[in-house]
């Protein structure tokens, strides 16, 4: 995900201007929004162009080498167009790698270093306080469209997956108090947000680090616990979509909330593989045979449930037989939304030492076969929706048509619903659409 801050409508000749680039995952986007909210509160304006700004901030991603390359390219572009650049984010946890290529940066900070970023901005271009510039909306600055927002409930992760370096970049799990999360969510909904996308490194582990401590919300105490938070969010009147949910046993508890319509019938659950031996090398939870049984039970409780997952092919030492286990599993699981990635060595990840690396051409072929198998599953599931009426949230609208998403589709990572409408629709509208045609990823229909 790449996001660039849009300028505000506020005018002020003395206000210093910031250009901002946000790279990486939705969690990083929330970090960017927090930094921008702080700076806007101090009177800084936002610039669409690097060459029109007093300083450029680049929030980097450092998870994969390809992400690092994208981050370094973004820094280079900012240096070429402006020259006064502050770097933050996950790649900032390895400053020597950045400084080696760009020694003249104003500052390099790691992830979650909000105060350090703001301090670096102050040093580069002090704020020009103005009572008219210092006003910001109560929901803060958002880099998403107005009708949806990411809601980060925790930081860090207690898992030690062998392919991942997130704990070394962002630390162990730190959960926000439930009351704080709910107050932020309420502000977003009051500001017009129709869809809350709950994110973290490990959403279903929420509150474990605090022993599920309670905090005040309205006239009662609410525990920092996965189910309790989901239930309370479901009372706010917006779509609530759960992301990055690990398959812990207590995930079963939220399925009835989905069946009751309290939260969306959607689970983003990164399973990564299906072969027991590969999962063991990954240090990933879950017995996939038992997981199939759980998925069946979930669908009995909530027939409309859509499960999204991601998988890695070409993990070190992955054999043909282990890959075939994965193919057999996805055919049987019939997941609604699936992504696939070729394993990419990450500096510092213990997976690099696990076994023989799978050749690039083999990884590419396995990904092709995986996505081909999943496309057949997806097409059957999508065609079953033809003739049905679905609720669709509109993302983009034109004179005679629009593009939106059903309850089974998250922004940017899932498919779309292409809508023909005889009446005007706007982004953020939730309309009923009769589905007339389907392909493997998108649906087509008419607003009714």
From Swiss-Prot:
One of its GO terms (molecular function) is 4 iron, 4 sulfur cluster binding. It catalyses: L-aspartate(89)-[ribosomal protein uS12]-hydrogen + (sulfur carrier)-SH + AH2 + 2 S-adenosyl-L-methionine = 3-methylsulfanyl-L-aspartate(89)-[ribosomal protein uS12]-hydrogen + (sulfur carrier)-H + 5'-deoxyadenosine + L-methionine + A + S-adenosyl-L-homocysteine + 2 H(+). Residues 143-380 form the Radical SAM core domain. Residues 16-126 form the MTTase N-terminal domain. Keywords: 4Fe-4S, Cytoplasm, Iron, Iron-sulfur, Metal-binding, S-adenosyl-L-methionine, Transferase. Belongs to the methylthiotransferase family. RimO subfamily. This is Ribosomal protein uS12 methylthiotransferase RimO.
């Amino acid at each position: 995900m790449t996001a660039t801050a849009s300028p505000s409508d506020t005018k002020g000749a003395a206000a210093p201007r910031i250009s901002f680039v946000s790279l990486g995952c939705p969690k990083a986007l929330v970090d960017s929004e927090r930094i921008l909210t702080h700076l806007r509160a101090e009177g800084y304006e936002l610039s669409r162009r690097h060459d029109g700004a007093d300083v450029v901030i680049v929030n980097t991603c450092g998870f994969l080498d390809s992400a690092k390359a994208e981050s370094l390219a973004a820094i280079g572009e900012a240096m070429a167009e402006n020259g006064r650049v502050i770097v933050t984010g996950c790649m900032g946890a390895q400053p020597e790698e950045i400084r080696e290529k760009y020694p003249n940066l104003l500052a390099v900070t790691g992830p979650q270093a909000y105060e350090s970023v703001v301090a670096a901005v102050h040093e580069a271009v002090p704020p020009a306080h103005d009572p008219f510039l210092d006003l910001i909306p109560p929901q803060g600055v958002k880099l998403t469209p107005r009708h949806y927002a990411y809601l980060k409930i925790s930081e860090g992760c207690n898992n030690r997956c062998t392919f991942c370096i997130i704990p070394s970049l962002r630390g162990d799990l730190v959960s926000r108090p439930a009351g704080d999360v709910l107050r932020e969510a309420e502000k977003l909904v009051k500001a017009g947000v129709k869809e809350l996308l709950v994110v973290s490194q490990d959403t279903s582990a929420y509150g474990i680090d605090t022993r599920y401590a309670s905090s005040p919300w309205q006239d009662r105490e609410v525990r920092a616990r996965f189910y309790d938070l989901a239930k309370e969010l479901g009372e706010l009147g917006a779509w609530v979509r759960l992301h990055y949910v690990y398959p812990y046993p207590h995930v079963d508890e939220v399925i009835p909330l989905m069946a009751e319509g309290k939260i969306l019938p959607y689970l983003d659950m990164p399973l990564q593989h299906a072969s027991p031996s590969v999962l063991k090398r990954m240090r990933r939870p879950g017995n996939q045979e038992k997981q199939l049984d759980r998925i069946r039970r979930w669908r009995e409780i909530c027939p409309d449930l859509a499960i999204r997952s991601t998988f890695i092919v070409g993990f070190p030492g992955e054999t043909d037989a282990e890959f075939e286990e994965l193919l057999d599993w996805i055919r049987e699981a019939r997941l609604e939304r699936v992504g696939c990635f070729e394993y990419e060595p990450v500096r510092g990840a213990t997976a690099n030492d696990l076994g023989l690396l799978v050749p690039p051409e083999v990884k590419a072929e396995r990904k092709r076969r995986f996505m081909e198998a999943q496309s057949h599953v997806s097409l059957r599931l999508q065609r079953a929706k033809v003739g049905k009426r679905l609720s669709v949230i509109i993302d983009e609208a034109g004179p005679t048509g629009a593009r939106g998403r059903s309850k089974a589709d998250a922004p940017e990572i899932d498919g779309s619903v292409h809508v023909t409408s005889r009446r005007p629709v706007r982004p953020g509208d939730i309309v009923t659409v009769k589905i007339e045609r389907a392909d493997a990823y998108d649906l087509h229909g008419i607003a009714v």
